[in-house]
Swiss-Prot record:
Biological source species: Caenorhabditis elegans
Entry function: Promotes mitochondrial protein synthesis. May act as a fidelity factor of the translation reaction, by catalyzing a one-codon backward translocation of tRNAs on improperly translocated ribosomes. Binds to mitochondrial ribosomes in a GTP-dependent manner.
Protein name per the record: Translation factor GUF1 homolog, mitochondrial
Catalytic activity, as annotated: GTP + H2O = GDP + phosphate + H(+)
Enzyme Commission number: 3.6.5.-
Binding annotation for GTP: 49-56, 108-112, 162-165
GO terms for cellular component: mitochondrial inner membrane; mitochondrial matrix; mitochondrion
Top EC class, one word: hydrolase
Length: 645
């Protein structure tokens, strides 16, 4: 055989080998038929892990091996720009995979504590999970949190030890940790390298063998649950659904339980990992549905969709997905007040895709109309702001985050009944709602139970940080010979803003943590007020624990000094407590002065110095008059820079 033809055949053979798993099911002109997959041939599973344990990499390998994508693709399920920039998963994604005659519905989830709501929402449609642990890092705080989320929902858990080919991998140690913490036997654990693909085929076999089939009824009217949704500018709200009963296809009429509206289904399909149309979605399957939902309130997570022919009274709704309470609140305003309406629409549409965000209308004299928005953490807040910018081209001002406080009002005829409509306890979300201290019996601040995993030798350093954050020490448990699980009870105000960054810095990145709500505790709160030339600027006011007031006052005053330009008169910046004028921190911006010595050309003889002093005296008196009647010009950029974290 000629050498040239032989080389050509070898090249074609290699090409076939490299592409043998890749499917053309992503062709939008072809309809995928999933009718062969009855519930017993379906497995719905998720991947949960701590940050940077290889979750997205494992998802990529599974997609490759099942023919959903060509080899060599990275972060296929991390579709958002912010996810690729930061290297983290923010949004749970789904992908329908075929393997050995089974339909495997993969639900990828975030790993950061701020996005635990995404994990919880994804688990509502999973029958099993892969609990992924990196062999070089071991069990981390979020690993423990994710385990208990799945355990409480009675979901099958498959432990998978990843990164076994790294030099620092310690498989035996990780097996010991999994045994001590979760009672997994070593023979239950799979050992893989998601990066190289080593033993990933065993993961697919374990999913089929260990994960139970979904509980679903084919011979029944259509009923499904929305577990995620997002807004498309051309097709409206697109709902990701789990079909529990019956089937749905293009042309069917369906009804929404909450708003009682009837819709015509225009498209159904699955994610592979991009949208692929299919003939119908059947019981037990996970996919998407388009039915011309035009407002963000029509595709709410947890909503029940059912066949129009079914009586609404006979429909059993779903209760698997619970709302999540925000931990931090921040003001959100458009940079240009004229952009308010377009930003309002962007916020509503983004909240459809992120239902853990809460929105309350707000306003400011300096910044105009806006919102006070609740987030699950500071990273969640930063990602929300980045998505507004990247996906909706919105320019926004995100203010310094704060937590919710509460006040117990005195039981007094005048105070409680007349001033507070008889309420025994009020919520305080922003300084403008801060009550007069004479009206309050006590203030309450939210507490959290913090779980940290730290190396033995760093226990003292971490305990010192927690003591500094006004914490109460809890239990200490050894998970192996080198690491400890430490529990502390801390104020949420100390944890929500920069605790994780401080913890990583002190432990050189070796510590991990997660937290959960742990009730309320009496505290002393103050309203930190900023006065500029004796006038209060309400936009800079903050509610903080009294112990943090002096340090925060110094930071705010220094920031304002940098941001406010010099005026023709003296500007005094003071940080005070409440309505008091006694300064915790104060600074003076000196006025601009005219140099009269240049006008006199150095001619100080023959009465020149007397003339100079006279000019300076007149200037001083004039500036004092300006200070009494003048308004300090504060540029809008100052609000952005001072109120940011």
């Amino acid at each position: 055989m000629p050498r040239r033809r032989l080389l050509k055949l070898l090249f074609i053979g290699k090409l076939r080998v490299s592409c043998k798993h890749y499917s053309t099911a992503g062709d939008p002109t072809k309809l995928v038929n999933l009718s062969e997959f009855t519930p017993d041939k379906i497995r719905n599973f998720g991947i949960v892990a701590h940050v940077d344990h290889g979750k997205s990499t494992l998802a990529d390998r599974l997609l490759e091996m099942c023919g959903a994508v060509p080899p060599g693709q990275k972060q296929m399920l991390d579709k958002l720009q912010v996810e690729r920039e930061r290297g983290i998963t923010v949004k749970a994604q789904t992908a329908a995979l075929r393997h050995r005659g089974y339909l495997l519905n993969l639900i990828d989830t975030p790993g950061h504590v701020d996005f635990s709501a995404e994990v919880s929402r994804s688990l509502a449609v999973c029958d099993g999970i892969l609990l992924l642990v990196a062999a070089n890092q071991g069990v981390q705080a979020q690993t423990i949190a994710n385990f208990w989320l799945a355990f409480e929902k009675n979901i099958q858990i498959i432990p998978v030890i990843n990164k076994i080919d790294l030099p620092g991998a310690d498989i035996k140690s990780v097996e010991t940790q999994l045994k001590n913490l979760f009672e997994f036997n070593p023979e239950e654990c799979l050992h893989i390298s998601a990066k190289s693909g080593l033993n990933v085929d065993k993961v697919l076999e374990a999913i089929i063998d260990r994960v139970p089939a979904p509980t679903a009824i084919i011979d029944a009217p259509f009923r499904s649950m929305i577990f995620d949704s997002y807004f498309d500018h051309f097709r409206g709200a697109i709902a990701h659904i789990m079909v529990k009963e019956g089937s749905v296809k293009k042309g069917d009429k369906i009804q929404s339980y909450q708003n009682e509206k009837v819709y015509d289904v225009s498209e159904v399909g699955v994610m592979r990992p991009e949208m692929v149309k299919c003939t119908e979605l059947r019981a037990g399957q996970v996919g998407y549905l388009v039915c011309n939902m035009r407002t963000v309130n029509e595709a709410v997570v947890g909503e029940t969709l059912f066949a129009e022919t079914t009586s609404r009274d006979s429909v059993k709704t779903f209760a698997e997905i619970k709302g999540v309470k925000p931990t931090v609140y921040a003001g959100l305003f458009p940079v240009e007040t004229s952009d308010y309406e377009s930003l309002k629409q962007a916020v509503e549409r983004l909240c459809l895709n992120d239902p853990s965000v809460t929105v309350i209308p707000d306003s400011s004299k300096a910044l105009g109309l806006g919102w006070r928005i609740g987030f699950l953490g500071v990273l969640h807040m930063e990602v929300f702001g980045a998505r507004l910018s990247q996906e909706y081209d919105a320019s926004v001002i995100l203010c310094q985050p704060s937590v919710e406080y509460r006040a117990k009002i005195k039981d007094n005829e005048t105070i409680r009944k007349k001033r507070y409509d008889g309420m025994e306890e009020i919520r305080i979300l922003d300084p403008s709602k801060f009550p007069d201290e004479s009206d309050v019996d006590s203030f309450l601040e939210p507490m959290v139970k913090v779980r940290m995993i730290v190396p033995n030798e760093m226990m003292g350093t971490v305990n010192g940080l927690c003591s500094e954050c006004r914490g109460e020490r809890g239990e200490i448990t050894s998970i192996d010979s080198t690491r400890l699980v430490i529990l502390w009870r801390l104020p949420l105000a100390e944890v929500a803003v920069d605790f994780f960054e401080r913890l990583k810095k002190l432990t050189s990145g070796y510590a991990s943590f997660d937290y959960e709500p742990d009730g309320w505790q009496d505290t002393r709160l103050v309203k930190l007020t900023i006065l500029i030339n004796s006038k209060e600027v309400s936009e800079f006011s903050q509610i903080i624990p009294a112990a943090m007031a002096r340090d925060r006052a110094k930071i705010l005053v220094q920031r304002l000094k940098r941001e406010i330009p010099r005026q023709q008169f003296e500007v005094t910046i003071k940080a005070c407590i409440g309505s008091s004028t006694k300064a915790l921190s104060q600074i003076v911006i000196q006025p601009m002065k005219r140099d009269f010595s240049q006008l006199l050309k150095g001619n100080f003889g023959g009465g020149g110095m007397e003339r100079l002093n006279k000019k300076l005296s007149h200037q001083k008196k004039g500036k004092e008059r300006m200070k009494m009647v003048g308004n300090v010009q504060i540029p809008k950029e100052a609000f952005l820079n001072v109120l940011k974290r």
